[in-house]
Every structure is written in C-alpha cells, then in structure tokens.
Amino acid sequence: MTNGNNNNLEFAELKIRGKLFKLPILKASIGKDVIDISRVSAEADYFTYDPGFMSTASCQSTITYIDGDKGILWYRGYDIKDLAEKSDFLEVAYLMIYGELPSSDQYCNFTKKVAHHSLVNERLHYLFQTFCSSSHPMAIMLAAVGSLSAFYPDLLNFNETDYELTAIRMIAKIPTIAAMSYKYSIGQPFIYPDNSLDFTENFLHMMFATPCTKYKVNPIIKNALNKIFILHADHEQNASTSTVRIAGSSGANPFACISTGIASLWGPAHGGANEAVINMLKEIGSSENIPKYVAKAKDKNDPFRLMGFGHRVYKSYDPRAAVLKETCKEVLNELGQLDNNPLLQIAIELEALALKDEYFIERKLYPNVDFYSGIIYKAMGIPSQMFTVLFAIARTVGWMAQWKEMHEDPEQKISRPRQLYTGYVHREYKCIVERK
C-alpha cells in the first residue's frame, strides 16, 4: 500500500503481466476499507472473480454496520441491543428511512401515516381467491405484493418526491398482506386493520382475531414480536437486500423490487432457516440424543447439519441471537412453558454443548438469529409456514431504506455483474440430418 497525492487518497498496487495499476483505496468511516477496482476491466482488460460476492462491496451505504468478528450490529450508528431494548419497530423504521431518530412530533406523524396506509384495495381479495387453500403464505404474499403496482400506476414512473410515500405505503401494507395470506391459508375471513392499535398489536390482531372473537394482545408477546421485528429489520447487503437493489437499479417500480426481495428471502438458506431449526430440534427429540446429533454434525460424510449455527458474516456470537435467547425465556415464562418446553430445553443444552466443543470453537460456529426465533414464534401460536412471512414484514423496512438510498446515490448504475466464461469456443452449426 502506498500513499497517493490525489486528494490524499491511498492506493493499492496491482501488477498484471508487468503493468502496474494504482487502485484507489476508499475509506470506510469504520470497518474495512475498500479497493476500488471499477477501472480494472477498462484499463487492464481483465474482470475480477469473486463467487458469492464474498469480498466485493457493491455499493456505499450509511444504513447498517456489521463487525462479524466482534459481534457488532448497528443501525445508523445505534447498537442493535439498545434499539431492541429501548425502541419500537416504527421508531426504528423512521430511523432507517430518514437517518435519524424522530422527535415526538415526527414519530406521531409517521405512525399516523403508516396507520392511514394499512388498508389494501378491496379488489386484492379476488387475487387471494385464485390460490388453492394449500398455498404457502409466502407464495400468496409474493404475488400480492407484486400486484400492488397495478393499484398504484403512478409509481410505475416514480421520482424523488415519491420515495417517502412509497416507503410508508410498503411498511404499512406488508403486515396486512401477511395476515391476509395467513387467514386465507387456514380458511378464515380477513380481518381489517385497527388504527387504534400500534403496529405490532395491529398485526397480532389481524392474525388471530375473527369476526366473532376479539384478540387480546398480551404485552409480553407484543414486546417480544417488537424485538423480533427490530432485530430483523436490516442486515447490510445480504441476498434479499442485494436482490432488491439489483432489481431497483433497472428502475423497476418499488413494489416489484420488494417482491423480488421476498422471493429471495423465501430460500431455505436465507429466511427459511428458523423453520429448519424447529424441524431439527424435533428430529433430535430429547436431550439424551444431543451428543449423537453433534457427532453427526461433525461427520463430513453425514448429511445432517446443525441448523441455527454459524453465519456468513459473524465469527462470534450473533448479537441478535443473544437478545432472542432472553426474549425466548421471557415469552415461555409468561406462557408457563419455561420449564416444560422440550424444544427450548434441547436448544439450550445443544448450545451449551456446542460452545464447549473444539470443533465448533475452531470453526467459529455460534448460534445465529434463527436459533431461538422459531421457538418464540411457535410459543406465540404462529405456524412454521408463517415464520418467513414475519421475517419479510421486518425486512421490508431495510429493503425500502436500501432502495431509497440506492436511488439517491449519484454513483448508482444499473447492476451488471460479469462472468468467467468456461463454455465452448465457436462451433459450426450443422443441420439436424448431419448430426450424430
């Protein structure tokens, strides 16, 4: 690394076949700096190769910071643990969209706007009726969110003045669509939003009330779900967020962009992992079986894997998992299940054993955010097919903040990754009768 004279930049040097290239080093406010390789292909006639974008920064962002080695997660500079304990989801949503925590008046106005936009067009009910009763709620939600662009044709050609309203509309309508997806999947009537309730209470109301039975929100359950939403609101440039940015880079309407994020989130390696944790705990069955399954997880020839352990970014304890572990105990204690919930007992003993095992220590495999969230959902009465739907409700805030930031970035270009072509070189076409 050498010091450059161009605006006090530092440069990295890359030598290709005897030719030296000076690559600017872009300074991060905290964390790893970035080598700017954007001119390499033009000047050196080479592309860079980075499968999975493990070492590539695709954008500049001021929204979320992660230090995976130290177990740090910040939203706009605020520690995730502080936000989970002291804030609420819509305050965090405001922070994500606008960059600062709101004043009392700003918070009040923001929550009123979200409540105002929580209804969806009545014609959307007809779309739900086209799905078979066994349809997965994520499939229904994916289609419903994408269809919103048909109800807001003005956003097919959006501009900067639309960013705020678009974010509010999306944050407001996603819980309604999520609850509608659930109600349809179990054959119950849709429940309309109630603007006298706050964001989390309203979602629980739409999920569990019926036209003939009111749902009384337990404050412990509400607080737990509020924390879960905050903890899942954003996580830097993960698969679904990158998908939203890539779709948005083409100028696609925001509802279409969010639907692509939902599709990516649905993958079992991304948003579906907490459901896999529940299935794994059920398979283990009892505490006595834990050593056997830990041994299976360490056997490279055994297909069994411990779900909820390890993370692409975190090489220490996931800070979100630490919050959720305590939240899980609070919820189960409130419901009278703390000492007799078999899934929690297996999870706690499995974690304790894994954290003392050299295999997991050497590989830095610690519990992640998915390890305890599924147990909380299950205790709340939320079925496993809804786990990823709730993830999408929370992550919509991050997607919209990232989408807005992308469109406000003067350096933004349409995304166009390159490839290393390893296929055939030119071949001559032969008529079908000449082929063997």
From Swiss-Prot:
Protein activity control: Allosterically inhibited by NADH.
Catalytic activity of the protein: oxaloacetate + acetyl-CoA + H2O = citrate + CoA + H(+)
Pathway: Carbohydrate metabolism; tricarboxylic acid cycle; isocitrate from oxaloacetate: step 1/2
Catalytic class of the enzyme: transferase
Top-level taxon: Bacteria
A Pfam short name: Citrate_synt
GO cellular component, one term: cytoplasm
UniProt subunit comment: Homohexamer.
Note: Citrate synthase is found in nearly all cells capable of oxidative metabolism.
Full protein name: Citrate synthase
Organism listed in the record: Rickettsia prowazekii (strain Madrid E)
Gene that encodes it: gltA
